[in-house]
Every structure is written in C-alpha cells, then in structure tokens.
Amino acid sequence: MAELTTLARPYAKAAFEFAQAANQLQSWYEALEVSAAVAAQEQVKKALAASALSAQQKASVFVQVCGDQLDEKQQNFIRTLASNKRLALLPYIKELFARMKAQQEKTIDVEVTAAYELPVDLINKLAQALSAKLDRNVSVHSSINKSLLGGVVIHTGDTVIDGSVRGRLAKLAEALKS
C-alpha cells in the first residue's frame, strides 16, 4: 500500500495544485470521490485490467461511467491517469487529495469510539477541546465498541489517544509483566 501511495502522490499533488489555483478544491474533491468509487468497483477493476482495451478506450469508458460528474479538466486528468496506467490509483489519489485539502482548510476528522453512546453535549465539548489542542476545525464522528468497557479512544490521522478502560487494563497488565 505504501508503494501505491507513493505512486499516487505526484498525481494527487498535481490535481490539488490545479484545483487550488482554479479555486475549485471542493469540486475536484467531489470528482475524485466519484472517480475513486468507480475505480473501486469490481467490474471496473476487471475492465481496467483487460489488455484488449487501449488507454484511450479505458479512459473513455471510465469517463462515461462517471457521467456528467466530471468537468473537462477532470476528464483530462482521468485520461492522463489512463495513459500512464494509473487509473487503479484513484482511491489513493483521492485520499491524498483529501489530506492536502484538510491541511489547507485547517480541518481534521476525528473518530471517537466509546463503549456506549456519548451525549451530544459531551461530543461538542470534546470537539471544542480537540479544536483548541490541534488548532484546527474538528469534525467528530462517533462509534460504539462495547469491548472498550468504558472511556473513549480517539483517532485522528496517525494519532491515537486511548482513554479506554480496556487500554488502561492492558497497560496495567504490561506493567505487571515487567
């Protein structure tokens, strides 16, 4: 996966720089979301892997599947990816583009996992505290995992804050083994 991300990075950067210069970050993000979803479809993967189709034919089919959701510049981007045999990288390109967009807009998605459903006011307080700590606008998504026993686990990017009872018990067990 790291290799695919490395291959996707220059394409994501080029798309981001173009979208930023054209003041179309959201439009490009939405187009990449659609394109990545199309590229992830099993039938599309098989069609892209078929050697019987030329790069131009693959791009044409791909653009047709996306329909009117891509403007001319975005279609050209798809054609460039097809000519370089990189259409399969679209999910990685979308992810890298999303990170660059979030960095530019100073936003971050935070996943909060708790043993039980958290009250809305607690989620709002948590969002405010994280926003102040991270100096970003925070978008909180919550989920439930009963195996945590209590507390919360917060995921943001590559950072994990484990405030769960299960995590504390694991640390205690590790300390007792030492």
Curated annotation (Swiss-Prot):
Keywords: ATP synthesis, Cell inner membrane, Cell membrane, CF(1), Hydrogen ion transport, Ion transport, Membrane, Transport
Membrane topology: Peripheral membrane protein
InterPro entries named among the record's database cross-references: ATP_synth_OSCP/delta_N_sf (IPR026015), ATPase_OSCP/d_CS (IPR020781), ATPase_OSCP/dsu (IPR000711)
Domain of life the protein comes from: Bacteria
Compartments where located: Cell inner membrane
This protein's GO CC annotations: plasma membrane; proton-transporting ATP synthase complex
Gene Ontology molecular-function annotations: proton-transporting ATP synthase activity, rotational mechanism
Keyword Phosphoprotein: no
A Pfam match: OSCP
Keyword Membrane recorded: yes
Quaternary structure and partners: F-type ATPases have 2 components, F(1) - the catalytic core - and F(0) - the membrane proton channel. F(1) has five subunits: alpha(3), beta(3), gamma(1), delta(1), epsilon(1). F(0) has three main subunits: a(1), b(2) and c(10-14). The alpha and beta chains form an alternating ring which encloses part of the gamma chain. F(1) is attached to F(0) by a central stalk formed by the gamma and epsilon chains, while a peripheral stalk is formed by the delta and b chains.
Function of the molecule: F(1)F(0) ATP synthase produces ATP from ADP in the presence of a proton or sodium gradient. F-type ATPases consist of two structural domains, F(1) containing the extramembraneous catalytic core and F(0) containing the membrane proton channel, linked together by a central stalk and a peripheral stalk. During catalysis, ATP synthesis in the catalytic domain of F(1) is coupled via a rotary mechanism of the central stalk subunits to proton translocation.
Family per similarity comment: Belongs to the ATPase delta chain family.
Protein name: ATP synthase subunit delta
Record lineage: Bacteria, Pseudomonadati, Pseudomonadota, Gammaproteobacteria, Cellvibrionales
